[in-house]
Amino acid sequence: MLHQIFRFNWKAWRALSAAEQQRITTAAINKLKEIAQAPAEAITHQSALYSQLGHKGDLILVHMRNSVEALNQVELQLAQTEFYDYLEQTYSYLSVVELGLYESTAKTYSALAARDIEPHSETWNAAIKETLDRQAAAMSSRIYPTIPEAKYLCFYPMDRKRGEEVNWYMESMADRQRMMHLHGMIGRRYADQVRQIISGSIGLDDWEWGVDLFANDPLTFKRLIYEMRFDEVSAKYALFGSFYVGVKLPIENLTAWLSGNLA
């Protein structure tokens, strides 16, 4: 999963003739549609465009692909367009969609311990793999999600604290499982209002996770995140990066956007 944040050079764009603007825009729309078109063999292949609010940028592109090579190919394809000459990438984020499996992991570990299976032994590893494979098959729609059609996007990266006094990774599995369960219960109350995609980025980018929230009412983002501020996981262990909010921009509406309109 790749997020690209761009600032648009409006001054340089306005210096072009109407004919040049139209030519560049048409080529950009065609290229973006080509990039978003999924090949038949792709498990997940999507790209979505958003008009960004605030000073951090003007456009957000979100890409979901099967591999980092495919994501890099998207970057290279975009860079070949003349439209790209008017974009300045101010931020990007690379991650992989993942599921929180604290509860199922705790149950699996307990079951293996009850059978006196030595942790990390060959038997242990085989049992863990079998469990993960079974869960992956059952939850494939969550592992390979589609980008929702919701009108608004809120993206932010985050960490779990690992300081000298407060360190998430030094807590026991049982305590982490308990806290994440309570944390998840808050999210479930908003399930009919917001769609969430969590992606992991340890070893891939500067933060540990990326969070994408999709909703048809932007105030839902505020209500959900505010309520979670009082949850132990967030209040005690969470660190948040910058927030990026955008309005869904269908690719064919790029012409209108370049004229100062969302539609």
Locations of the language-model features?
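Short amphipathic alpha-helices in soluble, non-transmembrane regions
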Residues: Q73-A79, R223-R229
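Glycine-rich beta-strand-turn "strand-cap" elements at beta-sheet edges
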Residues: A42-G57, A79-E149, Y190-D205, E232-A263
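Short, well-ordered beta-strand segments in beta-rich or mixed alpha/beta enzyme
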Residues: Q4, Q52-S67, C154-M158, D205-M228
